[in-house]
């Protein structure tokens, strides 16, 4: 963006916070900007397939052609060390794309957009999340493991610090939300259009039945009756905030401070 070159002009999920304003004041602009994602749907499908999933996996950092532009390494200027950058595991970017599609429709009632572009995006993102979820026999619930949620500081566990966390609450709940909105979009379409897109995408009754199972049996972690941010969140040690504030003053990048101390968030 205009603030600097740190992100090299890439597109993240920040449009999630901008589109609600545009939807009500300049909806034609939102519609045009949403085409950016649709035009990169082929690349998102390719990325999902390479990762072993179905549907479309949008990149955390997107550029001109829709490939994943997130770096593999990240420099910590406090320690001088280059560490793995696992931000490509922030798969919730696809949730943001789906949310923007649905919010645009809700604000404008533009059914033509859903028919031409939006439903296809929703279906392919829903497919990704259904394939991303794995069934836990013991819990009798579906789990989504190895992701990074909106809290990018927590990117793993002590024994696998860069492999993502399991069952991030935001990700799991919103994955179900995407599945339900994809079904809603299909239902809203006139029957001929619905049959056309189902044929185009090969969307079968059996696949929709699996969507229903995943949406009804998604695991959400709780601790003492409170939703946990992710599985194991309740086991995190509390930071000595006063000591770190006194020592460093600005602790906005606490992840860098702790890494320089050979520690981790």
Across the structure, where does each feature detected by a protein language model lie?
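Acidic, mature catalytic/reactive cores of soluble proteins
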Residues: 1-20, 24-265
């Amino acid at each position: 963006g205009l603030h600097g070159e740190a992100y090299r002009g890439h597109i993240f999920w920040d449009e999630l916070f901008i589109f609600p304003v545009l939807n009500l004041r300049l909806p034609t602009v939102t519609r045009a900007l949403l085409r950016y994602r649709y035009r990169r749907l082929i690349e998102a499908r390719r990325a999902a397939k390479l990762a072993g999933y179905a549907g479309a996996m949008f990149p955390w950092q997107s550029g001109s052609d829709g490939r994943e532009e997130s770096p593999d390494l990240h420099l910590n200027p406090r320690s001088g060390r280059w560490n793995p950058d696992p931000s490509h595991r922030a798969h919730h970017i696809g949730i943001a794309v789906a949310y923007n599609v649905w919010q645009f429709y809700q604000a404008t009632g533009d059914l033509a957009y859903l028919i031409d572009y939006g439903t296809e995006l929703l279906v392919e993102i829903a497919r990704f999340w259904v394939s991303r979820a794995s069934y836990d026999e013991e819990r009798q619930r579906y789990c989504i493991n190895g992701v990074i949620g909106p809290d990018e500081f927590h990117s793993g566990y002590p024994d696998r610090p860069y492999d993502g966390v399991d069952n991030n609450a935001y990700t799991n709940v919103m994955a179900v939300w995407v599945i339900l909105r994809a079904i809603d979009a299909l239902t809203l379409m006139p029957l001929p259009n619905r049959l056309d897109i189902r044929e185009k995408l090969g969307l079968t009754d059996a696949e929709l039945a699996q969507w229903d199972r995943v949406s009804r049996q998604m695991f959400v972690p709780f601790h003492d009756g409170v939703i946990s941010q992710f599985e194991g969140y309740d086991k995190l040690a509390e930071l000595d905030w006063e000591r770190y504030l006194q020592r460093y003053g600005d602790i906005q990048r606490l992840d860098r401070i702790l890494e320089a101390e050979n520690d981790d968030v």
